[in-house]
Amino acid sequence: MPSILTALARSPTLRALVIVAVAVMAVGCASLDSRARQLMYRPTAARPEPLPTLRPGDEQTLVEVAGHDGTTEHVALWWLPNADRAAPTLLYLHGTFRNLYRNHPKMEALRDVGFSVLAVDYRGFGDSTPIVPSQRSILADADVAWAELVRRQPDSCKRVIYGHSLGGAVAIDLASRKHVHVDYGALAVESTFSSLVDLAGSAVGPLGPIAVWLSSERFDSLAAIAKVDAPILMLHGDRDDTVPIALGRKLRDAAPPGTRWIEIPNGSHSRLHENAPAAYRAAFESLIASLCSQR
């Protein structure tokens, strides 16, 4: 079992959680919640150089939303349509740190499999309004993207909710509030965890969960996934050093019967589409083939 020091060395997020936990215990100050969220989600607005190359017909738009203080804020959406107009549409929910500019290669891999891709940058990320994200704001932004998904894809069984890492928790929460066939066709999650408390505790011991419990964030996917009534695809790499595969398996065990679980040998946290492109493609092609089959 890796030591606490080894885990801390590997993950800046987990190091940050421990720092926050110690600070909160020492100071006992609720105002540190904002700092905790900054360190948990590590929002990035930076654009990489060079910028990703978009295809003709791709769109980047900003949607107006109300901020917590009543001001107007913006949520950035990307639309990457498939050449096949009959293709299903995948709602792409990303994880911490990397905004959509840095998620573009994975989004393209999913488009190449056979999806049109609608993606959202939560506020604090990419071209969206720069704020310190929270679970509440992230879920609200996912709802904004959901409304656009419904507009873009009128056939409910061709809507797929997808999330990577933290985005998997967002996707599970969203799916738990919708219904198969009525609202969407399937849920797919990649490299995600059972709960934020479990993630912190598995890597740094007792201080990690303390940091989470002293913040306003939970992302309890264990509780939410039991409410999902659609087909579920779960992928996880056995070399994931950000979200241990044990947490993916724990989530799998709590999922409804029939959930499809795929472990990628030597698979990393963010590059399963590159670590095992054939297996990755086959998993999603199988998902596409099953859509609308039981309507």
Question: What is the predicted role of each segment?
Answer:
Residues 71-148, 152:
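Membrane-embedded segments
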Residues 106, 230, 244-253:
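Short alpha-helix in the alpha/beta-hydrolase fold that links the catalytic acid
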Residues 154-165:
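Alpha/beta-hydrolase fold nucleophile elbow
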Residues 170-230, 273:
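Hydrolase active-site cap/lid region
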Residues 228-229, 234-236, 240:
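Short beta-strand/loop motif that positions the catalytic acidic residue
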Residues 239-243, 270-271:
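Acidic catalytic loop of the alpha/beta-hydrolase fold
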Residues 267-278:
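Catalytic histidine-centered segment of alpha/beta-hydrolase-like enzymes
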